[in-house]
Every structure is written in C-alpha cells, then in structure tokens.
C-alpha cells in the first residue's frame, strides 16, 4: 500500500470577528479577506454591502467566483445591466471569470456574502461602466 499524501500546511481558521477591510475594493462595498495567500487554488473573503448601495461595475479577471448569501437580500447584476439575480440567505451564485457584474443592495439592512475565488488572493478589476475601460487607466 502506498503512503497517503501529507498536507502541505495545517488547518487554518479565520474568525468573523477578526476580519478587517482588505484586498480589492469597489465603491459601495466593504471587502474583508478571510483566507488568502494560503494556497494557489482558492481564497475566501466576506463582502458587506450597506443599505441602498451598489458596487462599481467590475470583474475578477481569470478567477471564477462563488457567492454564498449569509444575510440580507442582495442582487448580482450582469449582462450589461440587463440580468438581475436576487440572492437571499442560503443561496449560492456562480460568477464566471471575466464576467462583468455589479453587486446591489436595494434593501434597508446590510447584505453579507461569503466569497470564494479560484485564486491565491482576490482580484478585483473596476471598470468605468458596462463594457468600459479599467477604471483609473489613461485618466
């Protein structure tokens, strides 16, 4: 019988109470890295959207993103602003790599989402609008 592979690092914990603002930000959202720069294939963060706020239009480069709605009722807008996917607590949503989108909180309470991405650390590329240039470039 061949030996079982050994883990490359110990089990890690990121307590919710210890998360601080970090990583890529977009206007209207608070992003807090939870488990980043620990392994090449995945990272995790928390996103908090205050009531009546929305992010800039953005994408996450080559990273696929899975959203788990933890609290509040939020929306992912995509396809040039024409498609809306509403998330309530317990719902999952896949945002494919390079997909332009916007997070929206039209409600009266915070929206909190757990975010898992297919990379070592979250990548956030803010745009000037749907189909727009990378924000801040050439300005």
What are these regions (language model features)?
Residues 78-80, 87-107, 116-118:
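Conserved metal-binding segment of the jelly-roll/cupin
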Residues 17-20, 62, 90-92:
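A short, sequence-level motif marking secondary-structure junctions
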Residues 44-48, 66, 84, 92-94, ...:
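Conserved hydrophobic/aromatic beta-strand scaffold that supports enzyme active sites
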Residues 40, 62, 81, 108-109:
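Short strand-connecting beta-turns/loops that link adjacent beta-strands
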Residues 54, 60-89, 99:
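A short beta-strand-loop-beta hairpin characteristic of the jelly-roll/cupin
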Residues 47-55:
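Short, well-structured hydrophobic secondary-structure segments
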Residues 2-4, 102-139:
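Double-stranded beta-helix
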Residues 1-42, 56-57, 128-139:
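A short, N-terminal "cap"/entry segment at the start of jelly-roll beta-barrel domains
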């Amino acid at each position: 019988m061949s030996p079982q592979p050994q883990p490359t690092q110990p089990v890690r914990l990121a307590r919710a109470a210890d998360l601080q603002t970090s990583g890529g930000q977009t206007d209207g959202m608070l992003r807090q890295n939870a488990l980043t720069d620990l392994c090449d294939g995945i990272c995790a963060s928390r996103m908090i959207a205050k009531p009546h706020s929305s992010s800039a239009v953005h994408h996450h480069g080559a990273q696929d993103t899975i959203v788990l709605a933890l609290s509040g009722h939020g929306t992912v807008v995509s396809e040039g602003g024409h498609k809306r996917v509403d998330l309530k607590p317990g719902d999952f949503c896949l945002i494919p790599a390079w997909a332009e989108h916007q997070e929206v909180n039209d409600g009266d309470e915070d929206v909190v989402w757990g975010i898992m991405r297919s990379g070592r650390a979250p990548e956030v590329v803010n745009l000037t609008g749907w189909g727009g240039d990378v924000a801040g470039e050439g300005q």
